[in-house]
Amino acid sequence: MKHKPLIAVVDDDQSVREALENLISSVGFEVRLFASAENFLDSDTPAQTDCAILDVRLPGLSGLELQQRLAVDGQSIPVIVITAQADDKTQDEAVAAGAIAFLKKPVTEEVLLTALDAALKRKTDQQVVS
């Protein structure tokens, strides 16, 4: 039996985490929630994650720093970056580091699910190549 994709949500806003959990689990994916990048890194989740949704502004490591850390650690996790304060420089940094999408909060269901589909397709393509 094929496993359910595991989506990690890293956002310091509990209401955002819960809203994303409700949406993502409603389409059949497993969701794990984290209030900080450090909580995510300290868990066993990175090795199992099929896609990470990262807020830019987090306590401690930012979402962009987490994205870079995962890449340095050899974790090929597709990343979707979400933020309330979108600017061109931050978007350019996220995309240059390999983000699948850079989304401004509030994110619509359709936009997020489309980005998730693209991220999971990239993860599948990476697994086929390796």
Question: What do these predicted ranges mean?
Answer:
Residues 17, 59, 87:
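The feature encodes the CheY-like receiver
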Residues 42, 64-75:
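Short amphipathic alpha-helix used as the core "switch/output" element in two-component signaling
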Residues 33-51:
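Acidic, metal-coordinating helix/loop segments flanking the phosphotransfer/catalytic sites
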Residues 89, 107-117:
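C-terminal output helix
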Residues 65, 86-101:
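Alpha4 helix (beta4-alpha4-beta5 surface) of REC/receiver domains from two-component response regulators
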Residues 35-36, 62-65:
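Acidic catalytic/metal-coordinating carboxylates
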Residues 14-32:
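Two-component/phosphorelay signaling modules centered on CheY-like receiver
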